[in-house]
Amino acid sequence: ERRRLLKALSLNLSDISLNERNMCDLELLATGVFSPLDRFMDRSDYESVLDRMRLQNGTLWPLPIALDVSETTARSLEVGQSVTLRDPEGFLLAVLHIDDIWPVDREKEALSVYGTTDDTHPGVHYLYHRSGDYYVGGAVEVLSPPLRFDFRQNRLSPLEVRAMYRKLGWKRVVGFQTRHPIHRP
């Protein structure tokens, strides 16, 4: 019922077209991979993550997850407004209920996240040259996660991963992150 209501509501809402990086973040929010985070961060969580690597509630969180938009888009938005999130082809993915809009502090984010402001670092380069000038935070109601056709057998939700562990009889699992993790698009 809620899904049908949101689809009808979406016809009268402004749209934000997501880039690949934003779609990845939306997918991870939608599938619970970013749990307990279930929304694009507001400024207070964003600042808290940059300053202490924790959400405002104290939960350890190493990277900011906020929706970047252009200055033109940001100026057309208001706190309290709902907008649709669409893929580059215009397919409806979600409705975002905006809680916060703020300008990006690129230098602070680069130093906090990457430990450098060196433009040759791929993450810093993306932040300085491809990321939007503003962040938008708020609750997301996902209608359809982004469609993916590559590596489908590896795109598992946390529930599916836990079911796989049970099926395999695994009691203990070790996680490992490389020193140089794969960079997001």
What is the role of each PLM region?
Residues 1-185:
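Non-catalytic terminal extensions that flank enzyme cores
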